[in-house]
């Protein structure tokens, strides 16, 4: 899980930069619309909406934009947002790396076509539903920031029903739980004084594919970056493992 967490950390750092380009603004606004539509449009009673709003605020999205997205999801703003739907696509990257794409789109044909082009131009191929999803398990993940006492984290994690946790190298920890238990774990950690900076659903690979060849690494990371740059794509997950040095060189 370590390599996956490393990639997740890089993605969070990239999100701050991407926000300046407007890409993350669109993603997070759509996530708010969907959360408000699928539950009550009140964050106090809708955990999915509450976490989507927290992410939007962390990315610097203005409150007016957040309120507008909530209103769109609730159907009180106008415009046709009912056509937005969540779709998961699956495929393979260079070297047989498994890739899951979560999209939020109002035109699934357009989205599939864009994804197919991105895969084909970067050494991969878009597959059929189910071709790689069996290699992943969906989990709830709480990201805890700041100096963390591991014994206290273990105690709080057990109390909150966590399955496991992982200390990372940048003064953060990630605590994993079943999807249905994420809200309880999030609140338990906060009640115990931990600073939870993110609570999300994440696909965790059951097995990783080790990438050691520089050309393959560059092609793979370019593919993932291209996929994440598509307007309809909300999240991209893969099962590769790569050294920090190779990742840094490939991003350069």
From Swiss-Prot:
Pfam family, any one: TACO1_YebC_N
UniProt keyword annotations, A-Z: Cytoplasm, DNA-binding, Transcription, Transcription regulation
GO terms, molecular function: DNA binding
The keyword Transcription belongs to this UniProt entry's keyword annotation: yes
Protein location: Cytoplasm
Signal peptide start-end: none
Chief place where the protein resides: cytoplasm
InterPro entries, alphabetized: Integrase-like_N, TACO1_YebC-like_2nd/3rd_dom, TACO1_YebC_N, Transcrip_reg_TACO1-like, Transcrip_reg_TACO1-like_dom3, YebC-like
One Gene Ontology term from the biological process aspect of the record: regulation of DNA-templated transcription
GO cellular component, one term: cytosol
Domain of life: Bacteria
Family the entry assigns: Belongs to the TACO1 family.
HAMAP family xrefs: Transcrip_reg_TACO1
Record protein name field: Probable transcriptional regulatory protein Ava_1228
Organism, scientific name: Trichormus variabilis (strain ATCC 29413 / PCC 7937)
Lineage: Bacteria, Bacillati, Cyanobacteriota, Cyanophyceae, Nostocales
């Amino acid at each position: 899980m370590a390599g996956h967490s490393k990639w997740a950390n890089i993605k969070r750092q990239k999100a701050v930069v991407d926000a300046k380009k407007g890409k993350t603004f669109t993603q997070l606004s759509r996530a708010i619309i969907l959360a408000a539509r699928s539950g009550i449009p009140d964050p106090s009673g809708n955990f999915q909406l509450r976490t989507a709003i927290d992410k939007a605020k962390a990315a610097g999205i203005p409150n007016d934009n957040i309120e507008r997205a909530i209103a769109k999801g609730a159907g009180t703003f106008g415009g046709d947002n009912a056509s937005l739907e969540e779709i998961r696509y699956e495929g393979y990257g260079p070297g047989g790396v498994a890739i899951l794409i979560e999209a939020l789109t109002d035109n699934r044909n357009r989205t599939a076509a864009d994804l197919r082009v991105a895969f084909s131009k970067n050494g991969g191929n878009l597959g059929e539903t189910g071709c790689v999803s069996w290699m992943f398990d969906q989990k709830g993940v709480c990201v805890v920031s700041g100096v963390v006492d591991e014994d206290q984290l273990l105690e709080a994690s057990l109390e909150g029903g966590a399955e496991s946790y992982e200390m990372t190298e940048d003064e953060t920890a990630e605590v994993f739980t079943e999807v249905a238990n994420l809200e309880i774990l999030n609140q338990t950690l906060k009640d115990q004084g931990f600073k939870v900076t993110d609570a999300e659903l994440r696909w965790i690979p059951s097995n990783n594919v080790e990438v050691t060849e520089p050309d393959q690494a560059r092609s793979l990371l370019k593919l993932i970056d291209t996929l994440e740059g598509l307007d309809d794509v909300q999240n991209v997950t893969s099962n590769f493992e790569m050294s920090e040095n190779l990742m840094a060189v490939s991003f350069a």
